[in-house]
């Protein structure tokens, strides 16, 4: 997708550059042609200004009267002199009609016909033929407006000024390349969904029973230690006794025995010089092997110790153990096994 976008941008940029080059060549060529056209017009304008200036000077100096006398003596010659002056006007105007709109401002000085009428005071009959050639001079001037072909002048508005928009291609700096930041889709791998597959927590339970002395008495430490060892417990971790899978203390621990008095530990030196109100036997479910069989073994060990020390077996609330409480323990064990199955 990015390659297609880049290719399209490159093609569009190339087309824009070519268009700008063609437009530049076309405008420069047009400017040159307009410059060559304007030069002859400027020359014609300067010549006409000079002619009009000479005519004005002659009129002010009274040269007009001399022309009137010449017309009286040789009217044919006067016409010949006037005709060639008119002919260049016809020659210059048609090819460069674009300059004709400026002539109306210069035409008033070309009306020498009026000063020629001044000699009428002395010879009223003779100036008339002199006015006749002056009229054709005005007629072509009136016909000159036919040259409104000057409409070609609107071509001049095609000036280099329109080239100023050329800097507009600057926006074509391919700023769209900025979307290169599209690597943003990387967040798609939302691995957080993995926690959705949370495994159900493993249900656990602790079965507790106690062996305690009768009310108001305590168990002798020496007798208690002997009975614990006979039940297959071995002293071990956390300074308490553990019943392992094998009576010799090998294999995983099935259940444990702790002192009922805080902190619940026994003396590591295993001396019998102590007494205690009782001991606590507990089993964590699930455990190694068959939990129901382990519970039966735990119950047998508690009864054996109680018989040896002259105590009684109590439940987790330190009440007399009853058949209903035993069934409750067994139901709890089965519930844990089924929930973890």
Swiss-Prot record:
Instruction: Output the InterPro entries linked to this UniProt entry.
Output: Cell_div_ZipA, ZipA_FtsZ-bd_C, ZipA_FtsZ-bd_C_sf
Biased composition annotated in UniProt, kind: Pro residues: 157-170
* Spans through the membrane: 7-27
All ranges on the Periplasmic side of the membrane: 1-6
Q: Compositional bias of type Acidic residues: which residue ranges?
A: 51-63
- Key words, A-Z: Cell cycle, Cell division, Cell inner membrane, Cell membrane, Membrane, Transmembrane, Transmembrane helix
Q: How does it sit in the membrane?
A: Single-pass type I membrane protein
Tell me the domain of life: Bacteria
Q: Which GO terms describe its biological process?
A: division septum assembly; FtsZ-dependent cytokinesis
Describe its function: Essential cell division protein that stabilizes the FtsZ protofilaments by cross-linking them and that serves as a cytoplasmic membrane anchor for the Z ring. Also required for the recruitment to the septal ring of downstream cell division proteins.
User: Which NCBIfam families does this entry report, sorted A to Z?
Assistant: septum_zipA
**HAMAP family under this entry?**
ZipA (MF_00509)
UniProt family annotation: Belongs to the ZipA family.
Q: What is this protein called?
A: Cell division protein ZipA
Q: Which organism is it from?
A: Citrobacter koseri (strain ATCC BAA-895 / CDC 4225-83 / SGSC4696)
Q: Which gene encodes it?
A: zipA
């Amino acid at each position: 997708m990015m390659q297609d976008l880049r290719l399209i941008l490159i093609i569009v940029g190339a087309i824009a550059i070519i268009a700008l080059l063609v437009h530049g060549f076309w405008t420069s060529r047009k400017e040159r042609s307009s410059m060559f056209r304007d030069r002859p017009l400027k020359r014609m304008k300067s010549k006409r200004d000079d002619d009009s200036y000479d005519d004005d000077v002659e009129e002010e100096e009274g040269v007009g009267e001399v022309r009137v006398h010449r017309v009286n003596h040789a009217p044919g010659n006067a016409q010949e002199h006037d005709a060639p002056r008119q002919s260049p006007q016809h020659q210059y105007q048609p090819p460069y009609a674009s300059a004709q709109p400026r002539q109306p401002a210069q035409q008033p000085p070309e009306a020498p016909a009026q000063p020629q009428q001044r000699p009428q005071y002395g010879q009223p009959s003779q100036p008339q033929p002199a006015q006749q050639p002056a009229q054709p001079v005005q007629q072509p001037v009136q016909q000159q407006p036919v040259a409104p072909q000057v409409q070609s002048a609107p071509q001049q508005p095609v000036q280099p000024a329109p080239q100023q928009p050329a800097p507009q291609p600057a926006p074509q700096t391919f700023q769209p390349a900025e979307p290169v930041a599209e690597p943003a889709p990387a967040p798609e791998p939302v691995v957080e969904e993995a926690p959705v597959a949370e495994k159900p927590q493993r249900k656990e339970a602790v079965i507790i029973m106690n062996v305690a002395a009768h009310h108001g008495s305590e168990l002798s430490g020496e007798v208690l230690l002997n009975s614990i060892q006979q039940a297959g417990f071995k002293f071990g971790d956390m300074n308490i006794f553990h019943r392992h899978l094998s009576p010799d203390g090998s294999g995983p621990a099935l259940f444990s025995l702790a002192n009922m008095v805080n902190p619940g530990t026994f003396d590591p030196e295993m001396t019998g010089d102590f007494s205690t109100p009782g001991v606590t036997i507990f089993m964590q479910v699930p455990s190694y092997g068959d939990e129901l069989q382990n519970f039966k073994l735990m119950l047998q060990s508690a009864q054996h110790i109680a018989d040896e020390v002259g105590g009684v077996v109590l439940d987790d609330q330190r009440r007399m153990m009853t058949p209903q409480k035993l069934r409750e323990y067994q139901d709890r064990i089965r519930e844990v096994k089924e929930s973890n199955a």
